[in-house]
Amino acid sequence: YRKEMPEELAVINYTSGTTGYSKGVMLPYRSLWSNIAYCHEMLPVKPGDHIVSMLPMGHVFGMVYDFLYGFSAGAHLYFLTRMPSPKIIAQSFAEIKPRVISCVPLIVEKIIKKDILPKLDNKIGKLLLKVPIVNDKIKAAARQAAMEIFGGNFDEIIIGGAPFNAEVEAFLKQIGFPYTIAYGMTECGPIICSSRWETLKQASCGKATSRMEVKIDSPDPKSIAGEIICKGMNLMLGYYKNPEATSQIIDVNGWLHTGDLATMDSEGYVTVRGRSKNMLLTSSGQNIYPEEIESKFNNMPYVSESLVLLQKDKLVALIYPDFDDAFAHGLSQTDIERMMETNRIELNQQLPSY
């Protein structure tokens, strides 16, 4: 039998990491084992269970959650052969009825906005999003509609890879939809924080996973955002043939500096605020995290993607409209421009004055 060698290099996964330059992340077998073991600890899958693989295998999130996780248990893996549009994904869920679903936030957000909320009366949809306590029958109907869209046979949807829209998350939380948020990075193969959906706190990404330690580099982690630093079995060996970059991200005490800013409550739940290098500092001294504003924009009518930046000390949003959806509803180019201006005005009313 082959001797176990936990520190042996298993995978080199290339990533832009925290500096923008492509680097080869050297993941040892212990990292892959620890990540896969955590998946089974949180949500065991059985031989014959169905899993739809729609994340890119070149991304460690897809490699672990959409392949190694199910493969190690003898699950049946189904690979999408086309780009995962909401329509194609919904069709695959209906046919395959997966037991576990792993995806990026945008997929869930698009399906919720296009395929679930339209099934509810607009007034009810708005009520669910804004009122903390709603009628149990309304919540049950909304939850059932959402479950059916995703195949109706899953235990939990695992969302990761990008910030999750706050409004969509509030909707899912209110109807009792089984989702969880996973936070991580390639350098940890990938998971750093996560929790079961029953215990996940809204807006957080859960707690440190098994065999990992997480700290917030801040004088007051509960109220002042600081950099997320971590260490444990999931950590990489370093960057391939790049010791200088390795020493810049892993300090002498073995802590990996993620470059992400977050707070942590007294129970250990981590809430990511944004990237330290993305933080915008205004002339008035206000710290603004563009991801939080972009998340709101991306949930507004006919918005596909957004980018918030600072120009001459003014916040500016670059918007790429959802032209397919807009044209399908009969909107002209002029109508789309007017809608974007309406979105801007509405969002400004929700944001702090600074």
Language model segments and positions:
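Conserved S/T- and glycine-rich ATP-binding loop of Class I adenylate-forming
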Residues: 9, 15-18, 51, 101, ...
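Conserved AMP-binding A3 loop
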Residues: 10-34
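AMP-binding/adenylate-forming catalytic core of the ANL superfamily
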Residues: 232, 237-238, 261-354
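Conserved ATP-binding loop and adjacent catalytic segment of the adenylate-forming AMP-binding
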Residues: 78-80, 153, 157-159, 166-226, ...
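Conserved ATP-binding/catalytic segment of the ANL
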Residues: 15, 215, 222-282
